[in-house]
Structure formats: C-alpha cells, structure tokens
Amino acid sequence: MVPSLITPPPSRSGEATPQKDACLNPVNIAEPEGHWIKLPEALFSSIMAVEPEVNPLYRTSKALSDEWLKTALRMNDKTAVIWSRLDIAYMSAICAPHADLETLKLMNDWNGWVFAFDDPFDEGTFANDPIKAAEEVIYTLATLDNIHPVVSPDENPLRHTLQSCWMRFRERSSPSLQYRWKKHLTMYCVGVLQQVGVQHRATRPTIEEYMDMRAGCVGAYPCIGLMEFAEGIDIPQNVMDHPSMQAISRITCDLVTLQNDLCSYRKDLIQGEESNIIFILKDQGMTDQQAVDQIGEMLYDCYRRWHMALANLPFWGEGIDRDVIKFVTGCRNIALGNLHWSLYTFRYLGNDGPEVKRTRMMKLP
C-alpha cells in the first residue's frame, strides 16, 4: 500500500501592478483580481507571536527519515519525491528543538506514518466504508501489543511503520510515558473513525461536535507524547490528570485544528473536501471572510483559555514544576510548528505560502 500523498494545488499568486493616469492625475492602485480572504492576525498573536526555534539536527534527521520511509512504506520514486518536498521534518524540528538525532528521526517517521494512514480515511479506501475502516483501526492498534508478531513492510507497510515507531519508543521511554502514548494513539484512531461516521451524516456537525471530533483525529495528542519523550519530560500521571494540564493538551489540539482549517481552505475548495470548520460557519450564513474572522475570535478564545489554565496550575515542587514548564512550552511548540510548517510546505498553498504568511492574504479559486 503506497500512501496517497496529496498533490499540491497550483500556484495562484500574483501581484497587482499600479496603473498610472496621464500627467497630473493621481496614481490608482488596481484592486487585486479574484476572490481573496485576509487571514486573522490572531494566527500569530499571543503564544504564537514568537519565532520558532528549529532543531539544528533537522536536515540530518530529514535525510535519514526520507530514506527509511521510502523503504518502510514501499513508496515509488514519484511518491518519495513528493514526500520529501512536503518536509514534515521541519515541523518535527520545531516541535522538539532539543531532541537528539534518534528521537527526532522517530518523530519524522511517525509523522510519515500518520499522514499515510490518515489519507485513506479522508478520501480513499475507507472514507465510504465504516466497517472496513473499523477493521483497519483494530488491526493497526493490535500492533502496539508487545506480543504481536513483527510485521514486515511487504506484509503491510503502514502497520510495519507504526510498529517500528512503537518498538523504538518503548525501548527508551518510561512505563508511564508508554501508557500515555498508547492511549493517545488509541484516541487518534477512534477520532479517525468518528470522522468517517460524520462524513455519512445527512447534516453537518455543530461547531462543538466538530471541534471535539477534530481534537481526536487531528493527530496532536500523539505528538504531545512524542514531544514529552523528545524533550526528556516524565511527569507523574496524577499531575498529567490535573484539569489545567488536560486543558493545555486540548487547547493545543484546538489550535492545530483551527490553523489547519485556515491554511488548507484553498486546497479544500479545489479538491472538494468539506471537512473544514469554515464550511460549517458558512452554513450559518457567513461569508468566507466572516467565517475566517470568526476563527480568529476562536483563536483568541484559545489563548485566553491557555492563560487561565496556567493561572490555575498548582505548585508541585521544583522537579515536577520544571517538567511542567517544559511540557507547556512543548505544547506551544507543537502548535507553533504546525503553523509555520503549514505556511512553509507546498501541501496547502503550493508556492504561495511565504507570500501568504507575509501579507496574510490568500487567493481563493
């Protein structure tokens, strides 16, 4: 099975050129042609108003992962080139700026698995077959059992890749961290199934239902476990269960969801994909720009919830508090890495990402 990585949308950038009248008439600046939206300033506000720190091992880890994933996922040459250009390693390098090479490569490898695993549920083999989708999830999660036979790439590339990631994670992590990552992987797979179910509903989900569903399937929860592992964090489970710690994790998922929906909206329109909160808001009578502005308000609400959660954190003592600070920073870095990667990769905006980031303007088809 070869991952069906999404072909990038065509570049649609273009600068309007000033039009001059004769002699003394003032210069008139032509309005940009086409349908545009202005991304909300909230994308880069509050905890997102920082420049990301990039792991210096980023390019080395990318080269190693690109080669390994091509073999593990049985990519043909064309798919391998597309995957390399997506450059998921850039996101990993921001999510875990202090990780060693082995751990950073593990993050890249897992990101390779999750993108390849997710696509058939979005628009491929399992999107219209809930029974087959459930079977795939059951067989996939079974590979996390420590007594499961080793899966070869020829037998099943996706299960082989996840099992390899899990075995490497298990070798170097504590039992509590293993428990959390396995739990997060299960939550992700359940979220993917919920998304398949929503696609078969006659009506769109509410905003609350959509955000709950996306929190499970957006993939941020497993990233949090990998970030803990990469940054050397090992927080006791009773501390992780505190409402403020749970809130920080959930807000991270919400930030990633809203960032993704804004950055992928043009691609979604081009490809006819409607799993995006903007379509739900437009069903409520909003224009494209009004929906985007509403997402900006939702981002500001995320930042307020974040700071409220921090204010309600207890004090556990120097050792635990130090790890809690690293955890909070790591969760911020996950959202920060997702945001900067989304405007850096060609997956969503072709070659226009840097210009969209600079101007906050996105041209729609």
UniProtKB/Swiss-Prot annotation:
Binds 3 Mg(2+) ions per monomer. A motif (D(D/E)XX(D/E) motif) lies at residues 118-122. The keyword Lyase applies. GO terms for molecular function: metal ion binding; terpene synthase activity. Homodimer. Residues 1-11 have a biased composition (Pro residues). It is an enzyme of class 4 (lyase). Mg(2+) 2 binds at residue 118. Residues 1-20 are annotated as: Disordered. Disruption phenotype: Abolishes the production of koraiol. It comes from Gibberella fujikuroi (strain CBS 195.34 / IMI 58289 / NRRL A-6831) (Bakanae and foot rot disease fungus). A motif (WxxxxxRY motif) lies at residues 341-348. One of its GO terms (biological process) is isoprenoid biosynthetic process. (2E,6E)-farnesyl diphosphate binds at residues 347-348. The gene is Ffsc4. Mg(2+) 1 binds at residue 118. Mg(2+) 3 binds at residues 260, 264. Its EC number is 4.2.3.-. This is Terpene cyclase 4.
